[in-house]
């Protein structure tokens, strides 16, 4: 039996994933009972004498471990949320990471809490708006803690964030932390500054993101361009970057004589160096899931070298995943975690396909007894082999990550394979020259050498930028699928793969058939999603925004703060919305002006009492009525009438609507047939109404 540990880890991760997603549908218990009963019946009745019996036992034992880890994680989250939800507390915390906010002098931050009301505590919280601070700083202030909304709860728990923290008052900097994470965060800042000095803003932001993981200097235009070109994974320090740095740096630094060390000493030294470098990369890049997974594989490989264990990529991958989810089983739901593992599995599959195809070609050539090839023919064949390897691995990695992207509601690019074959080879020289420029920039005496590395890295990054900007302008650069349709397509492709494997269909027949099927599915999905109007509630349950979208345009009815604003921008990004035709600010007392870009703006707080504004945009027609203590917005879209309220509104006659877009405001002045809501806990809702009867989105073809 091969790879029993890998099968054990697959059982653990699979059950953690099932436990995280299925409870939301209310079908977890019957599904689990059916799964375990069916598995035991199949193993006991049909596979007792085959090697699959051992695999089944490993799978069940792994599932038991996954159940234990899931139970301990859920108990930990419930304990924290029951203790602090709804409280205003004094926190002392270390700033783990920051991103830009929408207001001057403010940042969005993730905090690791050290004390709550001067009592020791250990938890992570996210603050949407905090006075300016930097990663590695220790801060103090009074915050209001609350549980994340249902729509963002799973993503927050996957990041290890138990509660949201709203800053109230008393902010103070307590100095710099001395933890390993804080020290590496300051090192990241120094390396990023040394790397970017003397460069243009575009290449500098890309290099800082690729080499040090600092994405704060990356423009929104380049982010969108790389996503459209299918190269967004290049801008995140991932397993590919760790493999290049940990696998190639030592080989380039050691002289040839050292590379030929006899015995096991040389391999142990390299393994130790790679493990230390991987640890440093994990700290510098902020403990991202993809880097943690790759570093875990490097550490396990190094351990295998020291204990004379044979390396196995799949086993290392599985063990790294279990170790990453040991303290937080919800981490398996992180998109970065899933994309990283899917990409590695696809890369390994592509490598196996390349290896088998090369072996088959060599056997065929040996049978024909061809004479020795000339020099130029050998070079041409070597170039063709390298191109085939790049295309095959890129194709397998793209096919492996495609289900994750579409099932998680993210857009994907049709040109990921083209970009991978054309410019992915630039990543290694960019990383090596960028790393050289960053390290040399820390020593002022080495400024000339740093400038040489900097110019080379800047030139290569500029080439990559121009390619991304060019490809992102092609039609179909970003496409988005409905989740249900994406699930059907993924099941169809998985079934075809299984049939091809079972019937031993040749690769040159199976691969084009799969690509043709995937292409037809993409074309059909794109055609079906054209001219479909979607009405969604996003953001905080206390102040949700309304997003009405069709194709690449949208209308936004905004209310709330930074949390809602971030959710709106995430939704626009996932839906590939490029034009906001109208932005209606429903806030009656806004603390600041709304800064999101839009062709037309309406601010309710500037309207006269009982005045009405009507606007007709692409996806919808919106009518807004200002009252003394609130406003009413009526939306006509896709043959339906929607109404949403902000504040309190008293009308002479009730407003008729097909659907109420719910908020904490009491809808006494609205008659409706259905509800779209982010919460089932609003005070005005009937007690018999459960969360299973609610949804937060509506879609219909116009």
Spell out what each predicted region is.
Residues 97-178:
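OB-fold single-stranded nucleic acid-binding module
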Residues 162-297, 303:
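Aromatic-rich juxtamembrane segments at the membrane interface
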Residues 72-129, 142, 526-595, 601-603, ...:
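Membrane-interface segments at or immediately adjacent to transmembrane helices
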Residues 1-79, 88-92, 253-261, 265, ...:
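Transmembrane helix-bundle segments that form internal channels/tunnels in multi-pass membrane proteins
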Residues 17, 276-283, 299-306, 322-330, ...:
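Alpha-helical transmembrane segments of multipass membrane proteins
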Residues 203, 215, 325-333, 469-504, ...:
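Core dinuclear metal-dependent hydrolase active-site scaffold
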Residues 7, 33-34, 274, 278, ...:
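Hydrophobic core segments of transmembrane alpha-helices in multi-pass, intramembrane catalytic enzymes
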Residues 21-25, 282-291, 306-311, 327-337, ...:
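Membrane-interface helix caps and helix-loop-helix hairpins in membrane proteins
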